[in-house]
């Protein structure tokens, strides 16, 4: 995460709005942030070919070259060459990034006027841009090109991928959503995005999307009665990151954080070799959501024998990517989620609860910024027992390699699906998602956006390092430190110490 700072008062030198690209993470610059003033832009001025430039100028290039007045020829040729800077063409920098993922997943919008956005000329201040435009806080939001047209299409200077509205102005948290094969990740993300504004509101936050990627994802992966369920994410392909801003209001003040969601196919997590192209997104994650099909945990009678080892493989691969070494635990908070949990009502009674995360108002009528820990703890304990009884190896890997995790059960559809005449499954009634917001609200608690209405139980207590407690000598004369065995941290709110601490003494 990069903490973005406004310019300090009194002219003090600070890092002004440092930006880490959500696509390439500035790998070309060794991961160093770039300034908001160094962003590049996709131009609004676009000439599809040389003929269009000649039409604009009223002269052919060959006619300019044959002009006899040297001064007029130089001026005309300078104008022509300036326009050539705005020719529509393939962008080798952009294409180089997407060559790792077969092809780009960026889509055209109505605002593109039939021009593929990644073929627009990329310009920057001093090279096609005559003036930068800032907002009231001095943050660069647009640019005026050499032909007087204003563009708001900011792109990363290293990979030329689009930066959404206001990206880089506020602190950023990255969340990777990883779906083991068959877990229904695409359906889960579509339903989560569809309800995100309401889910945030129920926890006292405001949320709004800052790009087209979110609505494009929902439109391309619709979940509705009688509509075939969307296809799973193709291995080795990369969906566009999805962006939204989370606003915390406190009286007259507001704090904004940007959330970036990454869609990672579980097929890319089976081995380190498969993860090479996606490692950058996992490594830069501030939170993880791992979706597992209940069949892969032996929760149902028709267990998935072929992929029963997939959760263990994914957990081991993720640990290797994040820590890079054995013996070191991953500290990134991870929500381990059993999907399709409506199939498990008989063994998960908490899933049958109708109302989870009900908005609670304080004495002033303001919705409390909180996670419903009291409702969650019951589910967490049920989940821990079930996974221990049915997939102990998964529990062992989590305890050995992950410090901050918890169990969740979600259902993105919440109703039966029937197979149509083409052999494709579709919801048989209006989908009713259950508890799909809980993992991300738990991450919001981890990030400090909200608190819990009660202490949240860890799935397994963590033994704290020992203490050295001061024991006074006889009659209070002298004394010594006596080592006392570390206590068990049963709740997430209890901070885990890294070393032995001393208490008391002189």
Enumerate the predicted regions with their spans.
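Flexible phosphate/Mg2+-sensing switch loops adjacent to catalytic phosphate-binding sites
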Residues: 164-168, 197-235
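Conserved GTPase G-domain signal focused on the G5
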Residues: 184-185, 375-386, 414-452
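Conserved C-terminal guanine-recognition region of P-loop GTPase G domains, centered on the G4
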Residues: 249, 253-256, 276-401
């Amino acid at each position: 995460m990069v903490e973005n700072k406004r310019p300090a008062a009194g002219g003090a030198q600070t890092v002004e709005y440092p930006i880490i690209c959500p696509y390439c993470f500035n790998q070309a610059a060794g991961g160093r942030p770039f300034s908001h003033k160094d962003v590049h832009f996709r131009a609004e001025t676009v000439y599809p070919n040389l003929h269009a430039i000649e039409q604009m100028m009223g002269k052919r290039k060959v006619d300019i070259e044959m002009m006899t007045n040297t001064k007029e020829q130089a001026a005309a040729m300078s104008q022509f060459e300036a326009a050539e800077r705005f020719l529509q063409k393939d962008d080798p920098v952009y294409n180089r990034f997407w060559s790792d993922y077969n092809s780009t997943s960026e889509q055209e919008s109505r605002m593109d006027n039939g021009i593929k956005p990644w073929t627009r000329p990329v310009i920057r201040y001093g090279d096609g841009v005559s003036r930068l435009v800032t907002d009231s806080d001095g943050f660069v939001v647009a640019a005026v090109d050499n032909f007087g047209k204003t563009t708001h299409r900011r792109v990363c200077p290293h990979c030329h991928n689009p930066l959404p509205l206001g990206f880089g102005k506020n602190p950023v948290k990255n969340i990777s959503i990883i779906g083991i094969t068959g877990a229904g990740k695409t359906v889960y993300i579509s339903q989560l995005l569809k309800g995100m504004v309401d889910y945030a509101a129920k926890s006292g936050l405001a949320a709004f999307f800052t790009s087209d990627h979110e609505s494009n994802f929902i439109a391309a992966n619709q979940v509705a009665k009688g509509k075939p369920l969307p296809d799973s994410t193709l291995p080795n392909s990369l969906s566009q990151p999805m962006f939204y801003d989370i606003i915390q209001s406190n009286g007259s003040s507001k704090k904004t954080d940007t959330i970036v969601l990454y869609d990672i196919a579980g097929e890319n997590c089976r081995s380190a070799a498969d993860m090479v192209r996606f490692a950058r997104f996992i490594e830069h994650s501030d939170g993880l959501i791992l979706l597992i099909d209940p069949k892969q945990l032996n929760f149902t009678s028709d267990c998935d024998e072929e992929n029963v080892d997939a959760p263990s493989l994914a957990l081991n691969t993720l640990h290797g990517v994040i820590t890079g070494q054995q013996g070191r635990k991953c500290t990134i908070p991870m929500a381990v989620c059993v999907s399709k949990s409506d199939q498990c009502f008989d063994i998960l009674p908490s899933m049958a609860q109708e109302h989870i995360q009900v908005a609670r108002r304080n004495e002033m009528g303001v919705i409390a910024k909180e996670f419903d820990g009291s409702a969650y703890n019951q589910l967490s304990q049920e989940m821990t027992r079930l996974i221990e009884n049915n997939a102990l190896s998964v529990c062992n890997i989590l305890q050995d390699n992950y410090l901050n995790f918890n169990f969740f059960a979600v259902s993105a559809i919440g109703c039966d699906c029937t197979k149509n005449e083409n052999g494709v499954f579709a919801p048989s009634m209006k989908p009713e998602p259950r508890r799909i917001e809980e993992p991300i609200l738990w991450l919001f608690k981890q990030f400090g956006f909200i608190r819990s209405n009660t202490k949240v139980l860890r799935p397994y207590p963590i033994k704290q390092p020992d203490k050295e407690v001061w024991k006074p000598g006889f009659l209070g004369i002298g004394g010594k430190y006596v080592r006392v065995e570390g206590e068990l941290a049963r709740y997430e709110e209890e901070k885990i110490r890294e070393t032995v601490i001393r208490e008391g003494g002189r």
